């Protein structure tokens, strides 16, 4: 029996993780959850799974859930804030922590979980982007597995199993291309949030949907891949594959290319990470090759989708530059969703902050938190938020 903590249990990945646990109750047990402010969803999870702990970040939501548990004599202990997240990430009885919260908020709980010897099922891209070197070194120090919970890195992880790192020539990360694949800059001038949120293949949260539309999501995945698999940026390629059947590939020195293919469904990489190193009976629709008419691959347009280009630049620069990129992007996406900036301004703001805030500093926990704060305060004052 594996005991699981889910950070971000009410979001897209968290909800699908609950689906996996629901179907594997004999082998997976939900011990603790966290959420931001979705008190109604948390109450439903408590009623069904009866976790020992539930954490709410928002004060009012915390009180609602706490009162519900007291009034209904439910044993779930309700905690709040970052302190609560760290507590449930370091519980002695927990084997695996699923980090599916969005943004920098997942960084400290993830590091604390690693230091407590927990395997990490990582769906929070920002953790590796801003502090990849620190996270990977901590994982090695504490003999912890970092198991990627996204289709691309989960695919690469599988393609690398049983092979030697020195035999790898290139990692090929596939991208659907998002809702604006094939568009040029002039066609994206009047894009509204509702257009950018309509992803052609995946059902995702609002922030990651915008990242997919700008291709920033793929840029973050490139930086993640660098840290997860120890491959230079020159050997990490992005290929647009609109059918989303090939989830990523590894090219070896002898010319062989190993690809992982499956129906596009996030439950597969979640299930693989939770059950690693074993494979379980599929919870998704099997791939039917007779129904696949064609598979196509294209080069990404980095001029139109500037954030992907900037992610490569930030990754190669190293140090705190990925943290600057990430902090600026989180604020820029929020500004776009609130109608305060245009779609194409997202890339412009990333470029502006990378130029303004870069310092030759090691990516320690203190440094990345400090520079992230500087970027957010600057953009907050600029746009009065």
Curated annotation (Swiss-Prot):
Write down the superkingdom of origin. Bacteria
The UniProt record gives the binding positions of 1-deoxy-D-xylulose 5-phosphate as 125, 151-152, 176, 199, 212, 217-218, 221
Catalytic activity annotated for this protein?
2-C-methyl-D-erythritol 4-phosphate + NADP(+) = 1-deoxy-D-xylulose 5-phosphate + NADPH + H(+)
Looking at the keywords, is Metal-binding present?
yes
| GO terms classed as biological process | isopentenyl diphosphate biosynthetic process, methylerythritol 4-phosphate pathway involved in terpenoid biosynthetic process
Residue positions annotated to bind Mn(2+) are: 150, 152, 221
Cofactor(s) needed? Mg(2+); Mn(2+)
Q: What is this protein called?
A: 1-deoxy-D-xylulose 5-phosphate reductoisomerase
**Gene symbol of the encoding locus:** dxr
